[in-house]
Curated annotation (Swiss-Prot):
Belongs to the bacterial ribosomal protein bS16 family. PANTHER family: 30S RIBOSOMAL PROTEIN S16 (PTHR12919), SMALL RIBOSOMAL SUBUNIT PROTEIN BS16M (PTHR12919:SF20). One of its GO terms (molecular function) is structural constituent of ribosome. It comes from Glaesserella parasuis serovar 5 (strain SH0165). Keywords: Ribonucleoprotein, Ribosomal protein. InterPro entries: Ribosomal_bS16, Ribosomal_bS16_CS, Ribosomal_bS16_dom_sf. HAMAP family: Ribosomal_bS16 (MF_00385). PROSITE patterns: RIBOSOMAL_S16. Pfam families: Ribosomal_S16. The keyword Phosphoprotein does not apply. One of its GO terms (cellular component) is small ribosomal subunit. This is Small ribosomal subunit protein bS16. The gene is rpsP. One of its GO terms (biological process) is translation. The keyword Ribosomal protein applies.
Length: 82
């Protein structure tokens, strides 16, 4: 099954997440099919907090991909901001 989920990057105590399309059997930070955005939970000032290609999310969901709980909230936030 294909899922759209967060893949953690960044330094210790400073998380940065890529939003990726990946096989659900792959490790969290392992192999992915496509990178469709990022999420920076500790963005400050003018730093961009969320960038997400909503068209690609819609395309993958149409193909049968499922969203993780956190990504579903982020997609809703991105649609509201756009």
């Amino acid at each position: 099954m294909v899922t759209i989920r967060l893949s953690r990057g960044g330094a210790k105590k400073r998380p940065f997440y890529q939003i990726v399309v990946a096989d659900s059997r792959s490790p969290r930070d392992g192999r992915f099919i496509e990178r469709i955005g990022f999420f920076n939970p500790i963005a400050t000032g003018n730093a961009e907090r969320l960038r997400l290609d909503v068209a690609k999310v819609d395309a993958w969901v149409a193909k049968g991909a499922s969203l993780s709980d956190r990504v579903a909230v982020l997609v809703k936030e991105a649609r509201k901001a756009a």
